[in-house]
């Protein structure tokens, strides 16, 4: 693999040229053959623990892209590139190219050239919070459907758990209400025989089984995180704002009550004999006073202690909560059509279902007339 110096001389108009590799090479291209692209140097538009993100335009195609630059830490396994090369879905940010470069300190950086989206869901929500107006319930519903659609593909087709679902990792276009899942730096293909680290996922969105130290958790941790995202969009602030790992559990118990012995067993059997203060749950209808029964019931199905009782991504998509998006009804139907919301590749996204299950799911997924 070609590793370039990152101090390539700039042209007079600040254009840099790089040899890059296709993430999804066309049939006529050998994946090991680099292609040359050029783009203007630009300023940073985002940063995190992983590194920095630049926005720029590929000169050859006039395509706006984001370039995520990640230090290759030899102590940790970087699965992000290999996982992103596997993925192709309308609601997952597309990896177009990648290249490696070495800096003057001999550090190696992986550069991921990604599809560009205008902002994160976190930024979109902040806009409404600053305006002191709630986000439209219809906009929330569209974002959540697309999130669960991406997770259904990720969990069932790719067998990948994202492990860091939060508003900052959901990119949106506020004009079209399109949503795409990004940042696969924590993602992993979970195997039942292989333990996983429990200290994963940002605190406010951490599933209770992670807080209980489970190492054999499942893709269902992403569903809990998604429920926390939805709650935050409705409330305008995090539902469980813990100040530490244990305080996070306290915040959850304050609303959902003390988990039962059976629920604790499902999360982590090692805590079965642990004595917890007995707290009664608060009805979610009191937490979400402005929401209808259908919304509250849906959140109750997603925010369950027991990962086996928690809805999976496909059950979420089939929930009556989303029926409004499936109506053959003017404006809503147009948004649904434009976002290709109800277009599913049955071999890929629904391929894990038996014929009877597929028939039942299709009745719930596809458009309904009023």
Curated annotation (Swiss-Prot):
Residue ranges of domain Protein kinase in the record = 39-322
Q: Which residues get modified to Phosphotyrosine? A: 199
What biological-process terms (Gene Ontology) are attached?
Answer: ascospore formation; cell differentiation; signal transduction
Q: Which UniProt keywords apply?
A: ATP-binding, Kinase, Nucleotide-binding, Phosphoprotein, Serine/threonine-protein kinase, Transferase
Keyword ATP-binding in annotation: yes
User: Which chemical reaction does it catalyze?
Assistant: L-seryl-[protein] + ATP = O-phospho-L-seryl-[protein] + ADP + H(+); L-threonyl-[protein] + ATP = O-phospho-L-threonyl-[protein] + ADP + H(+)
Out of the domains of life, which is the source? Eukaryota
**Cross-referenced SMART domains, in alphabetical order?**
S_TKc (SM00220)
What more is known?
Answer: Present with 6990 molecules/cell in log phase SD medium.
Which family is annotated? Belongs to the protein kinase superfamily. CMGC Ser/Thr protein kinase family. GSK-3 subfamily.
Subunit composition? Interacts with TDA1.
Record protein name field: Serine/threonine-protein kinase RIM11/MSD1
Q: Which organism is it from?
A: Saccharomyces cerevisiae (strain ATCC 204508 / S288c)
Gene that encodes it? RIM11
């Amino acid at each position: 693999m070609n590793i370039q110096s990152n101090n390539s001389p700039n042209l007079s108009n600040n254009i840099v040229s790089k040899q890059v590799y296709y993430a999804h090479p066309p049939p006529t291209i050998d994946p090991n053959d680099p292609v040359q692209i050029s783009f203007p140097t630009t300023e940073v538009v985002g940063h995190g623990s992983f590194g920095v993100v630049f926005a720029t335009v590929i000169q050859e195609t006039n395509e706006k892209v984001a370039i995520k630059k990640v230090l290759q830490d030899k102590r940790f396994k970087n699965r992000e590139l290999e996982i992103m090369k596997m993925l192709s879905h309308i609601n997952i940010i597309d990896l177009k190219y990648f290249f490696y470069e070495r800096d003057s300190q001999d550090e190696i950086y992986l550069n991921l050239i990604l599809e560009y989206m205008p902002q994160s869901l976190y930024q979109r929500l902040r806009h409404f919070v600053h305006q002191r107006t709630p986000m439209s319930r219809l906009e929330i519903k569209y974002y959540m459907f697309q999130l669960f659609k991406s997770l259904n593909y990720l969990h069932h087709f790719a067998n990948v758990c994202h492990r860091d679902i939060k508003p900052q990792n959901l990119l949106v276009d506020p004009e079209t209400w399109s949503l795409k899942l990004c940042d696969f730096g924590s993602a992993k293909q979970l195997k039942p025989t292989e333990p996983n680290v429990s200290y994963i996922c940002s605190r406010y969105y951490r599933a209770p089984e992670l807080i209980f130290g489970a190492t054999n958790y499942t893709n269902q941790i992403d569903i809990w995180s998604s429920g926390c995202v939805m709650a935050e969009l409705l409330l305008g602030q995090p539902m469980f704002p813990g100040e530490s790992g244990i305080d996070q559990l306290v915040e959850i118990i304050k609303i959902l009550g003390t988990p039962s012995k059976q629920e604790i067993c499902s999360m982590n059997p090692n805590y079965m004999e642990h004595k917890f203060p007995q707290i009664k749950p608060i009805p979610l209808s009191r937490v979400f006073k402005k929401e209808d029964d259908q919304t509250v019931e849906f959140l109750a199905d997603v925010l369950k202690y027991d990962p086996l009782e928690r809805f999976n991504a496909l059950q979420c998509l089939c929930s009556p909560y989303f029926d409004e998006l499936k109506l053959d009804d003017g404006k809503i139907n147009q948004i649904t059509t434009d976002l290709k919301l109800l277009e599913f590749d049955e071999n890929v996204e629904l391929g894990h279902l038996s014929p009877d299950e597929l028939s039942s799911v299709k009745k719930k997924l596809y458009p309904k007339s009023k």
